[in-house]
């Protein structure tokens, strides 16, 4: 299945790792290195081995030239988040999942910088839908970023946004909403903001 997704990717991607000295970062490095070996369209680079604990562990999805696509995963994209991470790669590299024209137009209408944080756990079955929706929007519009956080490794964020349940969507560090959402529901929140 992975071969099919990777073979359809239109352009190569660079996966940049931001690590520190915790075992979870070593685990992320092994995980992403192994993933990178599955396709010649994925290159892996260690960007920082002494990254801040606010960032690490993190894998940023970048274009081949190192420019960020706006998609990133903070933690290890395994469990229920593995498929959504692979879809994020596919959506960033193109052609991506098919979008209805009205949805594409709404995504194009986002003109202000929109930073989305999606707080998840790897065992959450409702989180991937929101992750995929947010990443699809970010992959389509350079004004939008979608950073996914496994909150087990980011207690400060959990406390800052008073996260009692996941998924939790935070837009521009201000607008906080909880629960499963599709792409239209995410767009409604962004566009009314």
Indicate residue ranges for each PLM-predicted region.
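Local sequence-structure signature of Cys/Sec-based thiol-disulfide redox active-site neighborhoods
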Residues: 2-39, 108-142
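Structural micro-motif
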Residues: 12, 50-71, 158-172
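Thiol-based oxidoreductase modules, predominantly thioredoxin-like and allied folds used
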Residues: 20, 40-51, 142-156
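Non-catalytic, surface beta->alpha helical segment in thiol-disulfide oxidoreductase systems
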Residues: 61-96, 170-193
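Short, conserved beta-strand segments within well-ordered enzyme catalytic domains
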Residues: 14-16, 45, 60
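N-terminal leader/targeting and pre-domain segments
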Residues: 1-12, 84-111
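Short, surface-exposed acidic/glycine-rich loop or hinge patches that mediate macromolecular interfaces
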Residues: 22, 76, 121-124, 151-152, ...
């Amino acid at each position: 299945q992975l071969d099919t997704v990777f073979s359809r990717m239109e352009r190569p991607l660079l996966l940049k790792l931001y690590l520190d000295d915790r075992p979870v970062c070593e685990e992320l490095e092994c995980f992403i290195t192994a993933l990178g070996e599955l396709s010649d369209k994925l290159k892996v680079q260690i960007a920082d081995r002494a990254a801040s604990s606010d960032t690490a562990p993190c894998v940023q999805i970048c274009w081949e030239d190192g420019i960020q696509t706006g998609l990133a995963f903070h933690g290890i994209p395994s469990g229920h988040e593995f498929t959504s991470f692979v879809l994020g790669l596919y959506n960033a590299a193109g052609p991506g999942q098919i979008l209805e024209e009205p949805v594409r137009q709404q995504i194009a209408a986002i003109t202000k910088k929109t930073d989305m944080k999606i707080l998840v756990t790897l065992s959450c079955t409702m989180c991937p839908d929101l992750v995929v929706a947010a990443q699809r929007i970010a992959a389509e519009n350079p004004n939008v970023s979608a950073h996914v956080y496994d909150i087990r490794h980011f207690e400060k964020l959990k406390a800052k946004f008073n996260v009692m349940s996941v998924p939790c969507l935070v837009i521009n560090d201000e607008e906080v909403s909880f629960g499963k959402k599709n792409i239209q529901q995410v767009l409604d929140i962004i566009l009314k903001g």
